């Protein structure tokens, strides 16, 4: 899995909006697992809520960011969190869960056979990934990243795409799973101060989608110039309204139960 520098505090700035898809995914899981592994657990804020649904389960969170694991261990000492690469992790578990993480793993669908093989019969693989890579927040970022001014600095700062729900369904059905796949577009209404270019949408992107670009621009002046240019583009694509800035965000959900 590609190494990216993460800032747990920045990520958690929109925790209420970011956590909603996780709860929508978990609420549809039909099984009662004894062991749960959360791949790409981040700061552990949503991993910890799994005890509400399954209070007797043994829960483990895995992430490749030392900063995220440190924050998770600090905030949720009752849950086991471990540093690891989710692309190579082989958990012994009844429920393999991943929330908004697999998009960072190139060719992640090619890993499905070994993950399903590791599950017991009746075990569940459930995940959610963003499906908004064709939205302005991402297409504008890609265009700017590939522009003459920035292409030389940001080569390789892209990230993997995701499949469509029907493609995930086919892949997992071929592995003898019963599959529930769907998509939802959330209309996040972002509110609060937004006196810098890009405002609240830029603040959201700073927690996730911008991380590879920020890693590729260690010079503070270059980074500030890039963010200012990107922020101006976001302001035009996501204008503020009297009730806040509306950020449409498509998500893809899959629950596969091994037969």
Give the role of each language-model region:
Residues 1-37, 45-49, 68-71, 142:
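Conserved class I S-adenosyl-L-methionine
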Residues 105-106, 119-121:
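Helix-to-beta-strand junctions that scaffold the AdoMet/dcAdoMet cofactor pocket
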Residues 35-89:
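Class I SAM-dependent methyltransferase SAM/SAH-binding core
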Residues 43-45, 161-259:
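Conserved Class I S-adenosyl-L-methionine
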Residues 109, 124-195:
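Conserved catalytic/acceptor-binding region of the Class I
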Residues 95-109, 131:
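A short SAM/SAH-binding and catalytic strip from SAM-dependent methyltransferases
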Residues 35, 123-124:
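Short glycine-centered segments of the SAM/dcSAM-binding site in methyltransferase folds
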Residues 110-115:
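Short, conserved SAM-binding segment of the class I
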